[in-house]
Amino acid sequence: EIIPELDLIVIGEGEETFEELYDKVKDNSKDFTNVNGLCIRNKNSGYEFTAPRALIADLNSVPLPAYDLMETEIYFKFSSLPLSADSFNSKRRASTVWERGCPRGCTFCSHNGMSRIDLQNIYGEGDRKQGEKLVRISDKENDTFQLPARWPTPEYAVNNVKLLKEKFNVDFISILDENMTSNLKWTKEFCDLYVKEGLDKIVKW
């Protein structure tokens, strides 16, 4: 009601959903009911949910961001932040997010759609159709949604930083992961590889 121009919203991870939406729009289709992970405006009942979108289990399968499609120089011009001496003095800072989801369920958090707990809060406890079968997000037998927090490999994350350095001469990385140090094994491996690649000397974080 507040935004009458809004036809639908994407719930949770958008990579696969946006790809399917693009195909629909390209084909001039106005029927989005078979695209998972949407909330669609419905003239009769207000809105309706399509089937939940399964969480991406392998984050290494997600391509690195196409930074070259952005006007990066405008971004870098105003990228320094007064959070630390390094971030304040940086000339070309970039932000990254590698981890998705959260193993916790804090009621005050605005984080949505990246974990089983998030999806349960959105869709509720009832059955939902997924393909030809009904699923319940809280069902322990259905591992599609049993991924509270996920990380790509440390190599993926380091390659992301190397790309930013080599193509855009970034000198500071803001890692916006919400639970980076909750996975100590991953964090230690990332830090070891970061130093091994010599990035600690040229890209602060």
Over which residues does each language-model region extend?
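Conserved ATP/PPi-binding loop(s) of AMP-dependent carboxylate-activating enzymes
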Residues: 56-74
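Glycine-rich beta-alpha loop elements in corrinoid/cobalamin-binding modules
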Residues: 1-58
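Radical SAM [4Fe-4S] cluster-binding motif and immediate context
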Residues: 68-205
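Alpha-helix boundary recognition
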Residues: 2-4, 63, 195
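A residue-level signal for beta-strand positions that form part of recognition/binding surfaces
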Residues: 37, 47, 61, 93-95, ...
